[in-house]
């Protein structure tokens, strides 16, 4: 069994997200979420410490809109197509 050091439980989801950055809007998909942050799959992840504004399309109701900061990211690799680009973000409530 893996030792997960997270303090808050995460839920697996598949919610579309629009990320507003200093360079414009980027589309992605939230694949897991907690009260403190989320993992977002996208073609061109931002780098750690970059700030962004998220608009997450929830299945019911109004979208979640929140400022966030990138904690870590994984870039696509031309040598390994099993690596999925994405990033972990922390919500700035």
Describe each region flagged by the PLM:
Residues 13, 26, 52, 64-66, ...:
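Hydrophobic core residues within well-ordered beta-strands of beta-rich domains
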Residues 56-58, 70, 91:
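Hydrophobic beta-strand positions in extracellular immunoglobulin-like domains
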Residues 28-29, 66-73:
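Short beta-strand-centered aromatic/proline hotspots
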Residues 1-35:
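N-terminal helix initiation/capping motif
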């Amino acid at each position: 069994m893996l030792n997960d050091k997270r303090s808050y439980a995460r839920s697996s989801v598949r919610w579309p997200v629009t990320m507003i950055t200093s360079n414009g809007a980027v589309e992605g998909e939230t694949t897991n979420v907690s009260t403190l942050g989320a993992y977002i799959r996208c073609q061109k992840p931002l780098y750690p410490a970059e700030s962004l504004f998220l608009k997450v399309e929830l299945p019911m109701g109004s979208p979640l809109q929140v400022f966030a900061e990138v904690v870590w990211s994984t870039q696509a690799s031309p040598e390994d197509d099993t690596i999925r680009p994405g990033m972990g973000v922390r919500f700035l409530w």
